[in-house]
Amino acid sequence: MVPSDRDRVLAEAGVSRETAAALDLYVAQLTRWQAIKNLVGPATLPDVWTRHIADSLQLLDAAPQARTWLDLGSGAGIPGLILAIAGVRNRPDLRVDLVESNARKGAFLQETARLTGAPARIHVARIERVVAGFRGVDVVCARALAPLPQLIAWTAPLLKSGTIGLFPKGREAQSELTAAREKWTFVADVIPSRTDSSAGIVRISSLSDPLP
């Protein structure tokens, strides 16, 4: 029997039965709320386990020691809520903060975090306001939110103080890195995506002040 996308993703991730059940609940919530609020691209919902679950889970391996995460523009909880659901079973001290300015999407995040028991705090606010009050977070991440130069501008106070940035990108990764280097000095690498051969996770660290 050919395994389903769900079974394959869960097997590759090596999650517990409890985590699998929590991720199933997340997918059920996403499907239910999708009819009310367009949380993800409709064409991606049939491939939710690869396009969204597996694509999010690979970020855990990009920062294996991280305990505190800040997810910007979380929307449907991708990747932040998925990371919180999956990561807490192996990392009891994990904490994920999700930032989403849309109130209805924020309501989805609140309800789904409660139902799944995810260690997530939801901030229904603008990114600039939340980032200004954060220090000491291990990782800041964002998927499908903005070009890399804008992401760096939003997160500069964190990246300059030791936080690592993890930003999934598609074919535009290298061109966005080139544009960002015209404004900032930083260390970067691109981790190949496991779910899309044309995509990668841009990892940013050691940011310094903008170039003159």
UniProtKB/Swiss-Prot annotation:
Which Gene Ontology MF annotations are present? rRNA (guanine-N7-)-methyltransferase activity
- GO CC annotations? cytosol
Entry superkingdom: Bacteria
Q: Where in the cell is it found?
A: Cytoplasm
**Catalysed reactions, as listed in the record:** guanosine(527) in 16S rRNA + S-adenosyl-L-methionine = N(7)-methylguanosine(527) in 16S rRNA + S-adenosyl-L-homocysteine
Q: Which PANTHER family match?
A: S-ADENOSYL-L-METHIONINE-DEPENDENT METHYLTRANSFERASES SUPERFAMILY PROTEIN (PTHR31760:SF0)
Q: What is this protein called?
A: Ribosomal RNA small subunit methyltransferase G
